[in-house]
């Protein structure tokens, strides 16, 4: 299995994301997120991925939230927003999503995730808790505490 790599913010990353736009789910494209990060060149990239050879096959964004999320994490000063975890169709069910998720958990911070595209059961199997509420787009919100 590939190693989780920190993706740089540049036009090469935009090219790597092309397969996800072609084959992935429209809700997970990350076009605006990447463009916004490229404009602010001083920011650290929130993007991580797994390669098979030279091909990016799985990706996610981890956004470090430096404010208290009192609704879900009343005892924490910081948490991570796991944003748009996605694996290309032909590479699914090979453990890449779990590998990315375990990488996020290594930060030892609470994680808030939005379950898109029938991913709720996956998150529950990985130890996330359903807070039984939805985000403004109607997707389930799940949390994980270290």
Swiss-Prot record:
InterPro entries (UniProt xref): Acyl_CoA_acyltransferase, GNAT_dom, YlbP
Domain N-acetyltransferase: 7-146
Tagged with keyword Transferase: yes
Protein EC: 2.3.1.-
GO MF assignments: acyltransferase activity, transferring groups other than amino-acyl groups
Alphabetical keyword list: Acyltransferase, Transferase
Top-level lineage group: Bacteria
NCBIfam families: PRK13688.1
Name this protein carries in UniProt: Uncharacterized N-acetyltransferase SE_0851
Lineage of source species: Bacteria, Bacillati, Bacillota, Bacilli, Bacillales
């Amino acid at each position: 299995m590939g190693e989780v790599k920190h993706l740089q913010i540049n036009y090469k990353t935009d090219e790597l994301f092309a397969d996800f736009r072609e084959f992935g789910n429209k809700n997970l494209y990350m076009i605006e997120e990447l463009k916004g990060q490229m404009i602010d060149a001083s920011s650290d990239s929130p993007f991580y991925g797994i390669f098979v050879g030279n091909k990016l096959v799985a990706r996610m964004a981890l956004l470090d939230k430096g404010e208290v999320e009192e609704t879900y994490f009343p005892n924490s000063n910081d948490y991570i927003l796991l944003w748009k975890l996605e694996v290309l169709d032909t590479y699914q069910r090979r453990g890449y999503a779990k590998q990315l998720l375990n990488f996020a958990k290594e930060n030892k911070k609470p994680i808030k995730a939005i379950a898109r595209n029938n991913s709720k059961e996956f998150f529950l199997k990985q130890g996330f808790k359903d807070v039984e509420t939805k985000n403004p787009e109607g997707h389930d919100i799940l949390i994980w505490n270290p």
